[in-house]
C-alpha cells in the first residue's frame, strides 16, 4: 500500500497499546474497524450507508460552435467580422463528452424515486424499535437545582467553589421588608439603604439634585414659558398680602390716608 505523505504524523503513528500483527504492511491498520480490512474503495460513487448504485456510460453533446459559425464567439458570422476580443484558443466544433449515469432502465416508477433502493439494512428493525420506545422521563427540576447548588453538577464545579452558583430561596433582600411599611428606607435610584440607626435623612448629594423637587426638572429650550412662570410666581406671591393681618393693616393705612372721602361721595 502506497503511503500518503500528506497524512499527519500523529495519524500515521500507532499508539503504544496497539499490538503488532499481520497488518504491519498497512500503516493505517490501527484505524480500521476490522483487522486486515484494508482501505475502502471510494472510486465508485456511493451516498449514504452501503447504497449500491449501478452506473452506465453515457454521453451528451459538448457545447461548441456550429458548423459555419465564427470560431471566436460562435455567432453567425465570419471570424474576420467578429468584434469581440480574440480568444487564445478557438472554439471547437463540438462533440460528445462521456460521463456516468445511474442505470434506471429496469427500475419501476417508485424505485427510481427511492433513494434507498438497493440497501438491505439488517439494523432497520432495531432502529424502528428504538424509535417506538417512549423517551426517558425528564429529570425533576428541583433535584437538578439541588444538585447544582451542592456542587455535584459539572457546571457548578467549573463555576468555582468560592462563588455560589444559585441564590438560596430563603435569602431575602433586606429592603423588601420595608416596602409595605409607611416609609421606604431604600432609594432604588441611588441604591442607598438607610438603616435603623440613621437619624434623619442623608445629606443630598450633588448628583441627586433635582430628584427631591428642589429644582425645576425641564429643558429651557423645550419649554421656556414654564421657566418664566416659575420665576414670576415667587415675586407675585411676595407682593400679594398673605393672611388677614396684612389685609387689615393695608385697609387701615388706606383709611388713614384717604379718610372717609369714598363714603362722602356716596
Swiss-Prot record:
Residues 160-266 are annotated as: Disordered. Keywords: Metal-binding, mRNA processing, mRNA splicing, Nucleus, Spliceosome, Zinc, Zinc-finger. Residues 195-207, 244-257 have a biased composition (Low complexity). One of its GO terms (cellular component) is spliceosomal complex. Residues 173-194 have a biased composition (Basic and acidic residues). Transmembrane segments: none annotated. A zinc finger (CCHC-type) spans 68-84. Involved in pre-mRNA splicing. This is Pre-mRNA-splicing factor SLU7.
Amino acid at each position: 500500500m502506497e503511503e500518503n505523505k500528506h497524512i499527519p504524523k500523529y495519524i500515521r503513528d500507532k499508539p503504544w497499546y496497539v499490538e503488532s500483527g499481520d497488518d504491519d504492511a498497512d500503516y493505517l491498520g490501527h484505524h480500521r474497524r476490522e483487522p486486515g480490512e484494508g482501505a475502502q474503495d471510494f472510486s465508485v460513487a456511493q451516498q449514504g450507508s452501503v447504497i449500491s448504485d449501478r452506473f452506465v456510460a453515457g454521453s451528451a453533446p459538448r457545447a461548441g460552435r456550429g458548423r459555419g459559425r465564427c470560431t471566436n464567439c460562435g455567432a453567425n458570422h465570419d471570424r474576420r467580422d467578429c468584434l469581440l476580443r480574440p480568444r487564445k484558443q478557438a472554439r471547437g466544433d463540438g462533440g460528445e463528452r462521456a460521463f456516468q449515469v445511474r442505470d434506471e432502465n429496469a427500475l419501476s416508477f417508485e424505485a427510481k424515486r427511492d433513494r434507498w433502493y438497493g440497501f438491505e439494512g439488517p439494523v432497520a428493525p432495531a432502529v424502528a424499535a428504538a424509535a417506538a420506545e417512549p423517551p426517558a422521563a425528564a429529570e425533576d427540576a428541583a433535584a437538578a437545582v439541588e444538585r447544582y447548588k451542592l456542587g455535584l453538577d459539572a457546571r457548578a464545579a467549573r463555576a468555582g467553589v468560592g462563588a455560589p452558583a444559585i441564590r438560596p430561596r430563603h435569602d431575602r433582600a433586606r429592603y423588601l421588608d420595608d416596602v409595605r411599611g409607611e416609609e421606604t428606607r431604600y432609594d432604588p435610584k441611588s441604591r442607598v439603604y438607610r438603616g435603623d440607626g440613621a437619624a434623619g435623612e442623608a445629606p443630598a448629594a450633588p448628583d441627586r439634585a433635582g430628584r427631591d423637587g428642589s429644582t425645576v426638572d425641564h429643558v429651557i429650550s423645550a419649554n421656556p414659558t414654564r421657566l418664566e412662570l416659575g420665576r414670576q410666581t415667587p415675586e407675585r406671591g411676595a407682593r400679594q398680602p398673605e393672611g388677614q393681618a396684612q389685609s387689615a393693616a393695608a385697609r387701615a393705612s388706606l383709611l388713614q390716608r384717604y379718610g372717609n372721602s369714598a363714603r362722602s361721595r356716596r
